[in-house]
Swiss-Prot record:
The keyword Phosphoprotein applies. This is Leiomodin-1. It is found in: Cytoplasm, Myofibril, Sarcomere; Cytoplasm, Cytoskeleton. Belongs to the tropomodulin family. It comes from Mus musculus (Mouse).
Amino acid sequence: MSKVAKYRRQVSEDPDIDSLLSTLSPEEMEELEKELDVVDPDGSIPVGLRQRNQTDKQPSGSFNREAMLNFCEKESKKLIQREMSVDESKQVGRKTDAKNGEEKDSDASRKAPGPRQDSDLGKEPKKGVLKKSFSRDREEADGRGGEKPKEEKVIRGIDKGRVRAAVDRKESGKDGREERAAAARKEEEKTGSVKNAGLSRDKDKKKEEVKEPSKKEEVKLTAESRNTVGRREDGRLKESSKENKKPEDEGIGSGGRDWRKEDEKVKKEENQPDKEVREESKTKAPEKQAPSCPNKPSDGQARAEEEAAPSIFDEPLEKVKNNDPEMTEVNVNNSDCITNEILVRFTEALEFNTVVKVFALANTRADDHVAFAIAIMLKANKTITSLNLDSNHITGKGILAIFRALLQNNTLTELRFHNQRHICGVKTEMEIAKLLKENTTLLKLGYHFELAGPRMTVTNLLSRNMDKQRQKRLQEQKQAQEASGEKKDRLEVPKVGALAKGSPKPSPQPSPKPAPKNSPKKAGVPAAPPPPPPPLAPPLIMENLKNSLSPATQRKMGDKVLPAQEKNSRDQLLAAIRSSNLKQLKKVEVPKLLQ
């Protein structure tokens, strides 16, 4: 309200404004303060705090935190209930499978022949039956405590061993059946999900299928371990019964046979679901391949491009094979659809071509096979002058093969093989420098050597080749000039008519050998002698030339050793004047100008 007070002081002269301000409500006063803040900012407040906060707004939507938390709790409870229901359904399925297995085993034991004890052992009793049997054994032991303790102990041990073996078989059979049932249900659920789910679920199914065989292997190992334990116990029981009673031995033997038969049945039952799982996996394979078909149009497009590539390069290949005079350059740089086979076909066609001078295949994914084909082509081809192999997959072996082929090639002047996928290395660079010493035609090499030694040697060799090419060019020019001069001399023939008239003027360029037919009247007169040859230049003294090129210090040292040079006319005149006397001089009249 301080700013409003200031504003009131400023406008206190006008009573109408005071009355208006007094009638304003507090909300209107706040709005007025905001407007005054904008109109007349306070200099004492920092610049960043002078403007009102324009980001303070009321929430546009109704946000309730409690409602959101309640919703999250409900969703989490639903998920937990779903998981619990799935587990319960699995447990119920396992129980039903166990009951079915018990019924089957009881039927098999009833059919099996043998004494009563063995038939009872063949059955798989329930938990209540097992408890009753244990209680009966205890009562019998208490009642007959004084009579035949040794025999009772043996019988109890035999019964206990049989009961334990039966319990172990039960547990192993139940576990195997429960796991089989669970695996079968999972497979059924997977088949339903394959039909209904999209392509995104295929990956999860593959992972589950990979896990299933590992689980089955674990189940097999546990079942085998339990069977081995049961067999060991059976062997021990047999030995103890043989020592005590023979009839019991016979019963135990029959029971062991029954147990073996049951073990074989269990193994067969375990093998059957494995076979069924394999058959189902085979049937599922085509079903899984069917939904993955829409993901393969890219492969079809790539194949179509590869098939279309040969059609694109058929025409240039035919032109190269037929030595088309218009086809002087083969440039397939940066072509995406070209393959190594097509590049090899190009090199084979260029082997006997006499027109193409430039072969460029940069960034075409060419490998060592193409490099070896190019090496063979360079040995036979004598017209290609430029070869570009930049940005490819050629290794040191392919590059060395090309340089060895250059020993038999005298036409290639430019070779580029920079920016390969594989580094050439120290050994290949040294070999390149050695091989280039025997080549005298290569002028440009597109490669940056990593080592300083090969780099300097190659630059020196290339400059040597440049000098040799320049010398050859100069020699060719001289030979051409001499040949043209000889042709001009042969073409210049003197005019017959002018000499027949007997003109006294000689020709400006007299021929050294005049023809005898030119002057029939003067046949007896001897021919005029040819003009004297021009004077030869004075011979150069090699020592003087050496002194002129040597530094001044050496020249001073060798001045005394130099021979006397020939004197010119001025020097001779001055020497004669110095050696003459007044008596020898002749009197000469003074010219009039000097008088």
